[in-house]
Amino acid sequence: MSVGLLRILVQNQVVTVEQAEHYYNESQAGKEVLPMLFSDGVISPKSLAALIARVFSYSILDLRHYPRHRVLMGVLTEEQMVEFHCVPVFRRGDKVFFAVSDPTQMPQIQKTVSAAGIAVELVIVEDDQLAGLLDWVGSRSTSLLQELGEGQEEEESHTLYIDNEEAEDGPVPRFIHKTLSDALRSGASDIHFEFYEHNARIRFRVDGQLREVVQPPIAVRGQLASRIKVMSRLDISEKRIPQDGRMQLTFQKGGKPVDFRVSTLPTLFGEKVVMRILNSDAASLNIDQLGFEPFQKKLLLEAIHRPYGMVLVTGPTGSGKTVSLYTCLNILNTESVNIATAEDPAEINLPGINQVNVNDKQGLTFAAALKSFLRQDPDIIMVGEIRDLETADIAIKAAQTGHMVFSTLHTNNAPATLSRMLNMGVAPFNIASSVSLIMAQRLLRRLCSSCKQEVERPSASALKEVGFTDEDLAKDWKLYGAVGCDRCRGQGYKGRAGVYEVMPISEEMQRVIMNNGTEVGILDVAYKEGMVDLRRAGILKIMQGITSLEEVTANTND
């Protein structure tokens, strides 16, 4: 206990000067003073927390309702948490909030984390609750992690990974299996195994956000990476270049197999491994669950049910383009049609569809696959991505000769897709005569329905600056914000919803394209014809109580 805290107790007449001197001497003798204060009946943990919060103007956090899995394990070591008697409990931007019962520890905390660019904020907690949380942190290294680190030297003995029962039942395989199982339960899309000079960490990407879940012993970093490479049939002896692989695992008897795409990357302190969980469940391909507004859904369904043409989906990596395309294919997947796809790689396994993984090294490019498809009597073709003029020309030829073609590009919005194709060298006539509809999309985090709370609306001028109209402001709707609870693991968000910019290619737009119209000109026609852009689609989601204002402004352009 610090002298500063004893001084505060004296100033607030909780203890006398003589008592303070007594407790100070006890602390100098190595004894814990706060438990003595509590056991002597001088003050209770609750009263002490209230006093400290009032004196220092800090907020109080009740740890009885705090979801412990939110503890930020990568900010301080367990030893530092015990030494400073604090726990990092949550993060807001570059600020990390530390739960403390003695705020005079703040300088030591700041000194420790300043090199990482972390701004320190404190919240006051009752000392007995903090002790309980520290005990939980200490026990968090489960018996599996302890076993994982016991007797391990930092070496890469590949004899550990022979294919027999003893190897499969070892601590490293079991730890990996548990990590992957935890990732599935948490709804993660990606798993990051990262290795640094003095520590290692594993992070899950859930609803688009990365968060740390565990720190395995640094001594086994090579064994973790090698084991994953064996499971995904990669070369464990090659550590100098990136490798890509794939694995399929079943986590319970009779359960569905789960596919993982694996990527390794040589770094300064070992190979980083990222695993993408591939959701191959066709049952999830429900158009009503994707977040389309009713009029957008109608436009899309009209376009995909045409006998021929091209539907293009655009957006950044991780924006849900593959799911949107496969949802369309799932709708069209009947006994009477022949569907072929070329992907890099195929992420969703859909029965009844002929799926091809492209392999540039072997000459099986998107363009080569497309040429072969046209000799396979196809009705519907999907190309994972139009990357070059050759692929674009073949796809357009297919759309012009009686086939329905689906593909993706990486652009910021729907009108920019036409500009991208023109820049590739595609003739304006070919674009105008083949493209039926372009759809841009983003994924926004859904507010957790269990804990979202109504918040006060910003001023009308502030909302208008975001994109709200006078008509919007006159309507009766509530603005909600993120809070955090056990169901959403303290994030305030659970799941994601799509926002879409659906732009059908009308006759007027065809004329603009034929006349080498600019992106601005195309956008002007789209707005006149009633297109809703991504920001507007996000505003509709805010008014429906699905997402927050912060989420929309962070992920869409005004």
From Swiss-Prot:
Any one GO BP annotation for this protein: protein transport
Family: Belongs to the GSP E family.
Subcellular locations according to the entry: Cytoplasm
InterPro entries noted in UniProt: AAA+_ATPase (IPR003593), ATPase_typ4_pilus-assembl_PilB (IPR013374), P-loop_NTPase (IPR027417), T2SS/T4SS_dom (IPR001482), T2SS_E_N_sf (IPR037257), T2SS_GspE_N (IPR007831)
GO molecular function terms listed in the Swiss-Prot or TrEMBL record: ATP binding; ATP hydrolysis activity
A single Gene Ontology CC term: cytoplasm
Organism per entry: Neisseria gonorrhoeae
Keywords annotated in UniProt: ATP-binding, Cytoplasm, Fimbrium biogenesis, Nucleotide-binding, Protein transport, Transport
Record-linked CDD domains: PulE-GspE-like (cd01129)
Pfam families reported in the protein's UniProt record: MshEN, T2SSE
Keyword Methyltransferase annotated: no
UniProt binding sites for ATP: 315-322
The protein's name: Type IV pilus assembly protein PilF
Function: Involved in the translocation of the type IV pilin.
